[in-house]
């Protein structure tokens, strides 16, 4: 499916519909990121981030809107959700190239997981099947198909502890405000196993083990039990990441996603 980046006209139509009394609405810039489709805009002196679901999902933007409504008011607040467009308040701060130290990251995730649940469960198998079906046929390997069949037969691990998850924790989704960290981009959020969140964070193996130790202490979970549960989720999270890169390559034609996918496959094959 050809990828079509949202145009300024589409954005202006959304703003006119959502903010009819606005005296001025100007597109400041298209925000960088692998997902595309995000714009920083100013409406009557209020800075917002507007994002359109370019894949025309009927559920994703409303879910993100509801997720942000349930989260603490210190996070980005949802303003409008119309026809696949979502506008949230802009969080000022710095985006850094690396994740925070393990104690800070563990505290951030534990605090999130203490919040009330969203009300909808994360189901990985439909996402894995979608990525396979919407990827380039030439990129569908026997290894991918075998792993997909194996996970489908096994089924998802039984949750160790259910909580609201972000599911996309990486440096680009963390805003640093002095001594405070804020998560942004909640489009993949939902309720799931806390061990799944730890398996999905973009970390090397050594740092992930340190995070497991830190989190187990905070959450009063047996460290060995948590480590084993994260290990059960690792093939799922690895395939989710590799499949996402493959699908994004098919949508955009950007070979950056091939490089990222190849590295994700390498990691899956060496585990």
Predicted regions mapped to residue ranges:
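A conserved alpha-helical element in kinase catalytic cores
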Residues: 46-87, 91-114
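Active-site Asp-x-Gly
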Residues: 177-227
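A glycine-centered beta->alpha junction motif in the catalytic cores
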Residues: 84-98, 114, 127-137, 239-254
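Active-site acidic catalytic loop and adjacent metal/ATP-binding pocket
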Residues: 35-43, 50, 152-198
């Amino acid at each position: 499916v050809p990828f079509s980046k949202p145009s300024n006209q589409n954005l202006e139509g959304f703003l006119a519909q959502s903010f009819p009394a606005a005296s001025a609405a100007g597109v400041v810039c298209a925000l960088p990121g692998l997902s595309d489709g995000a714009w920083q805009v100013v409406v009557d002196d209020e800075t917002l981030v507007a994002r359109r679901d370019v894949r025309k999902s009927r559920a994703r933007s409303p879910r993100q809107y509801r997720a942000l409504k349930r989260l603490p008011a210190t996070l980005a607040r949802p303003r409008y959700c119309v026809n696949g467009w979502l506008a949230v308040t802009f969080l000022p701060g710095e985006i850094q190239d690396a994740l925070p130290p393990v104690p800070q990251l563990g505290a951030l995730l534990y605090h999130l997981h203490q919040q009330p649940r969203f009300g909808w469960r994360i189901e990985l198998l439909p996402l894995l099947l979608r990525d396979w079906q919407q990827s380039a046929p030439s990129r569908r390997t026997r290894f991918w198909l075998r792993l997909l069949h194996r996970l489908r037969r096994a089924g998802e691990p039984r949750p160790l502890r259910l909580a609201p998850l972000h599911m996309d924790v990486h440096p680009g989704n963390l805003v640093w405000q002095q001594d405070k960290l804020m998560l942004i981009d909640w489009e993949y959020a939902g309720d799931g196993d806390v061990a799944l969140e730890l398996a999905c964070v973009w970390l090397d193996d050594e740092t992930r083990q340190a995070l497991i130790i830190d989190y187990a202490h905070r959450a009063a979970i047996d460290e060995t039990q948590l480590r084993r549960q994260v290990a059960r989720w690792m093939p799922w999270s690895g395939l989710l990441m590799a499949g996402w890169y493959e699908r994004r390559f098919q949508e955009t034609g950007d070979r950056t996603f091939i490089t990222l996918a190849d590295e994700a496959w390498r990691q899956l094959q060496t585990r």
